[in-house]
A protein has these predicted regions:
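Transmembrane helix-loop junctions at the membrane interface of multipass transporters and ion channels
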Residues: 57, 113-124, 188-193, 220, ...
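Mid-bilayer segments of alpha-helical transmembrane spans in multi-pass integral membrane proteins
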Residues: 77-82, 101-116, 133-149, 262
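Loop-to-helix transition at the N-terminal end of transmembrane alpha-helices
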Residues: 30-46, 64-71
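Structural signature of hydrophobic alpha-helical transmembrane segments
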Residues: 2-16, 60-76, 129-144, 187-201
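Membrane-interfacial segments at transmembrane helix termini in multi-pass membrane proteins
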Residues: 251-270
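C-terminal ends of transmembrane helices
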Residues: 17-32, 77-96, 147-162, 205-218, ...
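Transmembrane alpha-helix boundary signature
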Residues: 49-66, 70, 81-91, 108-124
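Small-residue-rich segments of transmembrane alpha-helices in multi-pass membrane proteins
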Residues: 37-50, 97-111, 168-180, 224-237
Length: 270
């Protein structure tokens, strides 16, 4: 059995564990079990990814890549454990918002990497690849700045008052129209300037979307950003041809959106 087949089988097992984790987290009685399923699924996913990276042909760049991978795992694990231990339960929403910003930033970086180091593809596949890059960068950039603003508001490092700009809804609408126009242009002619433009546009839109919402509604915003981070992860999965990222991203995106809907109804918000 090839390394890719083993990794794909591990990804399927991890995806099933993530689904079981969501099911467990839906009830207070099974919450701890759900967390354990999630930990097990993530451990399997990381192990499969490391195994896949070690199974290829070895060269000088392979050693460098493995060194960076190990360093990232160690640094990320240490920081994650430290933050999880020192944060109080009342500070959990701001910590989650900060985590979402990392997911968004990752989607932006992966999208840019996919654009700068694109393989030779047929015209049809190249158009699909360009659309994946553009959409992934757009969603990721919105998630990144939106999550940063949510973190700053929840941690009282930024005023919780909503930012009211003249015609703010029209600004958001024009930004979305601009995204559609830029996407079509980039699919036709994938130029670096268009990618820079959509990145700046999405960063500004993410900041404005969350800054214009008051601090009292931040729990709903964090839930919505959770959904955005899921779709950003799914877009990253399409770029990397990683089925696990696509499945888990869709799970997080859909569950986050539904949770936001429930919270809006409970808080009498539109």
């Amino acid at each position: 059995m090839s390394a890719l087949a083993i990794a794909n089988a591990a990804y399927v097992a991890a995806a099933l564990l993530f689904i079981m984790s969501l099911a467990g987290l839906s009830k207070h009685e099974t919450g701890r079990t759900g967390v354990r399923y999630g930990i097990a699924g993530m451990a399997i996913a990381i192990a499969a990814t490391v195994w896949l990276s070690l199974s290829g042909e070895w060269s000088d760049s392979t050693y460098l890549g493995i060194g960076l991978l190990v360093a990232a795992l160690i640094v990320g694990a240490v920081i994650g454990l430290w933050r999880a231990k020192v944060v109080a339960m009342t500070g959990m929403p701001e910590l989650i918002a900060l985590f979402h910003s990392f997911v968004g930033l990752t989607a932006v970086l992966v999208g840019w990497n996919g654009a700068l180091h694109a393989k030779e593809l047929s015209p049809d596949l190249a158009a699909v690849h360009s659309a994946e890059v553009f959409i992934g960068v757009f969603i990721g950039a919105i998630t990144f700045t939106g999550s940063i603003v949510a973190y700053l508001k929840l941690s009282a490092k930024m005023s919780s008052k909503p930012l009211i700009l003249p015609g703010r809804n029209f600004l958001n609408l024009f930004a979305l129209i601009g995204f559609v126009v830029l996407t079509v242009a980039y699919v036709i002619t994938p130029e670096l300037g268009l990618l820079i433009a959509v990145t700046v546009l999405a960063l500004a839109l993410g900041w404005h979307l969350v800054a214009s919402i008051g601090g009292g509604d931040m729990p709903v915003v964090v839930s919505m950003l959770n959904s955005y981070s899921g779709w950003a992860a799914a877009a990253t999965g399409f770029l990397l041809s990683n089925n696990l990222l696509i499945v888990t991203g869709a799970l997080v995106g859909s569950s986050g959106a539904y949770l936001s809907y429930i919270m809006c109804r409970a808080m009498n918000r539109s």
